[in-house]
């Protein structure tokens, strides 16, 4: 998968390219990431990338010309089919379903805003979709972009090694994940549930599913509203409640 990022702080994306799951994906050629800095497209000695908004008000906006030229350069390098995404509080909220939609694209260009944002006409003419990671304010689009990259890359074939690793993540089936345990069997008088030590794979599967359903009910009941539970899931959830 090819990823382009338009950002004033390309150094931040070393966290993606040099570490963890995404770093291994880049090293193994499963993920290609390139950055474009609007400062490199300025024409003044100060490399100015901000400008005053029409109508006044506090703060500055990203200057149109350097930002637009950076986006055009990213498009030229990544391909005309690349989907351009602007990370924005006004965008569609990123969910696992959204991640599954985005991973179907061969290439994405992520535009990271700074200051008070970007000119609305850039959004109208250059951006295909706006995405948000939540209803709160950040200093820029870099952290949301890294969040999106990390979540999407986990679904790229070969990145996690085992397909089941992604399938068992929280939200992969619309539910929160079940509890997990490792050694020792007893920690501060708390024991690993006996079913996980039984070796009975069917019992373990049902226990994990029931715990996943129960945890979702207790912590994120809103998720259950959008799910059509199977007969087995309904039975296990009823048993959990009882």
UniProtKB/Swiss-Prot annotation:
<keyword id="KW-0819">tRNA processing</keyword>
<dbReference type="InterPro" id="IPR029026">
    <property type="entry name" value="tRNA_m1G_MTases_N"/>
</dbReference>
<comment type="function">
    <text>Specifically methylates guanosine-37 in various tRNAs.</text>
</comment>
<dbReference type="InterPro" id="IPR002649">
    <property type="entry name" value="tRNA_m1G_MeTrfase_TrmD"/>
</dbReference>
<keyword id="KW-0489">Methyltransferase</keyword>
<comment type="subunit">
    <text>Homodimer.</text>
</comment>
<feature type="binding site">
    <location>
        <position position="113"/>
    </location>
    <ligand>
        <name>S-adenosyl-L-methionine</name>
    </ligand>
</feature>
<keyword id="KW-0949">S-adenosyl-L-methionine</keyword>
<dbReference type="Pfam" id="PF01746">
    <property type="entry name" value="tRNA_m1G_MT"/>
</dbReference>
<keyword id="KW-0963">Cytoplasm</keyword>
<dbReference type="InterPro" id="IPR016009">
    <property type="entry name" value="tRNA_MeTrfase_TRMD/TRM10"/>
</dbReference>
<keyword id="KW-0808">Transferase</keyword>
<dbReference type="GO" id="GO:0005829">
    <property type="term" value="C:cytosol"/>
</dbReference>
<protein>
    <recommendedName>
        <fullName>tRNA (guanine-N(1)-)-methyltransferase</fullName>
        <ecNumber>2.1.1.228</ecNumber>
    </recommendedName>
</protein>
<dbReference type="InterPro" id="IPR023148">
    <property type="entry name" value="tRNA_m1G_MeTrfase_C_sf"/>
</dbReference>
<feature type="binding site">
    <location>
        <begin position="133"/>
        <end position="138"/>
    </location>
    <ligand>
        <name>S-adenosyl-L-methionine</name>
    </ligand>
</feature>
<dbReference type="GO" id="GO:0052906">
    <property type="term" value="F:tRNA (guanine(37)-N1)-methyltransferase activity"/>
</dbReference>
<dbReference type="InterPro" id="IPR029028">
    <property type="entry name" value="Alpha/beta_knot_MTases"/>
</dbReference>
<comment type="similarity">
    <text>Belongs to the RNA methyltransferase TrmD family.</text>
</comment>
<dbReference type="GO" id="GO:0002939">
    <property type="term" value="P:tRNA N1-guanine methylation"/>
</dbReference>
């Amino acid at each position: 998968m090819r990823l382009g990022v338009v950002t004033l702080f390309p150094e931040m994306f070393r966290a993606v390219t040099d570490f963890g799951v995404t770093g291994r994906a880049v090293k193994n050629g499963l993920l290609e990431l390139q950055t474009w800095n609007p400062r490199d497209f300025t024409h003044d000695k100060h490399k100015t990338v901000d400008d005053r908004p029409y109508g006044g008000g506090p703060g500055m906006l990203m200057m149109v010309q350097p930002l637009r030229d950076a986006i055009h350069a990213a498009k030229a390098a990544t391909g005309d089919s690349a989907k351009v995404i602007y990370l924005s509080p006004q965008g569609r909220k990123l969910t696992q379903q959204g991640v599954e939609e985005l991973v179907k694209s061969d290439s994405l260009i992520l535009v990271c805003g700074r200051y008070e944002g970007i000119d609305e006409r850039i959004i109208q003419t250059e951006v295909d979709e706006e995405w948000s990671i939540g209803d709160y304010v950040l200093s820029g689009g870099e952290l949301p972009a890294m969040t999106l990259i990390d979540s999407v890359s986990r679904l790229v074939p070969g990145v996690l090694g085992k397909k089941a690793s992604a399938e068992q993540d929280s939200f992969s089936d619309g539910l929160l994940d079940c509890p997990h345990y490792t050694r020792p069997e007893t920690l501060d008088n708390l024991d690993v549930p006996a079913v996980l030590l039984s070796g009975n794979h069917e019992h373990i599967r049902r226990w994990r599913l029931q715990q996943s359903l129960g945890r979702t009910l207790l912590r994120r009941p809103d998720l259950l509203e959008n799910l059509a539970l199977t007969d087995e899931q309904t039975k296990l959830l009823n048993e959990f409640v009882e």
